[in-house]
Regions:
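Phosphate-handling active-site elements
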Residues: 76-85, 111-128, 132
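DPxDG-like acidic metal-binding loop motif
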Residues: 96-124, 138
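N-terminal, well-ordered alpha-helical segments
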Residues: 66-73, 106, 110, 127
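Short pre-catalytic strand/loop immediately N-terminal to key active-site residues, enriched for Gly-Thr
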Residues: 84-97
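Conserved beta-strand termini and adjacent loop/short-helix elements that scaffold enzyme active sites
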Residues: 55-56, 89, 141
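ATP-dependent small-molecule kinase catalytic core of the GHMP/sugar-kinase superfamily
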Residues: 2-31, 118-173
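N-terminal beta-alpha supersecondary unit
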Residues: 2-82, 93
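Broad, structure-driven detector of short, well-ordered beta-strand segments within folded domains
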Residues: 42-44, 87-88, 145-148
Length: 173
């Protein structure tokens, strides 16, 4: 049985410019996304049927609101796969704006691709990810990218962060 361990990295938006609000509730933006070392950890393996999800936090559930489960369902609808078990260790604060849920979804897409030897291209994974959330496409490749539209139009860059940086995330209110 294949077991896949993957880190699911956070991102920061550098120089975020909100251009306007769209009729669908999203905003058109221009930004630079930078992947950072802070990450969640996922262990993903095959199972006979369905998506079995567990986590080290009690606020994430194995339901249709969970982005990991949503990512699995998209792949199951498109490809001949059975099930997966997902164990998620959360290290990134929820609601922090660092994209942890989107990053987790992208990690599930990439892991299913490898575990089931699907050979789906990054471009196709990006297309699937865009149906899950605006930040998911960025996390398929990660690194440093210019993001436009709602964040789904991406152009890769060489890393722009040099030196050290400090991210302050307020605790839960």
């Amino acid at each position: 049985m294949k077991i896949f361990k993957i880190n699911s990295y956070a991102k920061v938006n550098m120089g975020l410019k909100i251009l306007n609000k769209r009729s669908d509730g999203y905003h058109n933006i221009s930004t630079i996304f930078q992947e950072i070392d802070l990450h969640d950890e996922l262990i993903i393996s095959k199972n006979i049927n369905g998506c079995q999800f567990s986590s080290n936090v009690n606020w994430l559930h194995n339901d249709q609101n969970n982005l990991c489960v949503i990512a699995y369902n998209h792949m199951k609808d498109l490809y001949d796969i059975k099930g997966i078990d997902i164990m998620l260790t959360k290290n990134i604060s929820r609601g922090s704006g660092l994209g942890s849920g989107s990053s987790n979804a992208a990690a599930v897409l990439k892991s299913i691709n490898k575990i089931y030897d699907l050979n789906v291209s990054d471009d196709d994974l990006i297309e699937i990810g865009s149906k899950i959330g605006a930040d998911v496409p960025f996390f398929i490749k990660g690194g440093t990218q210019i993001g436009e539209g709602i964040g789904e139009k991406l152009i890769g860059l060489k890393s722009v962060i040099k030196g050290r940086y400090l991210i302050i995330i307020p605790g839960p209110t």
